[in-house]
């Protein structure tokens, strides 16, 4: 039987909406979870214990936050919508281990906030129902900063989650797969139906688990340049890497032979498409490119 105090039920969420006269903002991608079973699955996948610090993005009315607070040492939640701050102050009042920061996660000084609020935690996890319209920027922003995050269990649009977790050669595999898998080991936790949200989103959802690698999957001396090179191979998915790189490099059309030579030395067939290349293949291309100063972009 569900605790009738749980926020993640249709009746309690509706009561809070009425109490605070809250209207959803489509521009902020607000879809509140109203199913405790889904939340419990997220908590279980997160392996949270009494020594874990949690970063949550977009707590909404606190349906996931309250469950995190019951399991974790501390919860640091970022909420962009000022209208939700009094609601969260109300719903989370029983918990003294939760800090809510009213800021845009993409503009916040996350490193400083972690140092101030989660410094005594042995492990840090990001656990969140992410705003779907900025899922990718949020994840890349967190992964590419010097923040001691051990892993992520996050809900997102199903299509985006499948891209993060995609295998080489699959339709969903692309530059986003490469960046995320460079930093983390990815796995699917569960698919989530539209019916467990208020209001229901227009798309299906998925929960994915991303655990930080102790070392990146490949070693490169400039991650930004490496990711740009990989992304260029997917510029036009139906074209070969040879064609895509001719369009990518400055004066690429004049350096057709150089591009072919570069691909050959890296052991990559120029007729292949970007989605057939592994992260290791792109690392070979990146290293070999250093021998060809003509290839600028």
From Swiss-Prot:
It is an enzyme of class 2 (transferase). Coiled coil: none annotated. It catalyses: adenosine(1518)/adenosine(1519) in 16S rRNA + 4 S-adenosyl-L-methionine = N(6)-dimethyladenosine(1518)/N(6)-dimethyladenosine(1519) in 16S rRNA + 4 S-adenosyl-L-homocysteine + 4 H(+). Gene3D superfamilies: Ribosomal RNA adenine dimethylase-like, domain 2, Vaccinia Virus protein VP39. GO terms for biological process: rRNA methylation. SMART domains: rADc. Signal peptide: none annotated. Its EC number is 2.1.1.182. It comes from the Bacteria. GO terms for molecular function: 16S rRNA (adenine(1518)-N(6)/adenine(1519)-N(6))-dimethyltransferase activity; RNA binding; rRNA (adenine-N6,N6-)-dimethyltransferase activity. It is found in: Cytoplasm. This is Ribosomal RNA small subunit methyltransferase A. The lineage of its organism: Bacteria, Bacillati, Bacillota, Bacilli, Bacillales. The gene is rsmA.
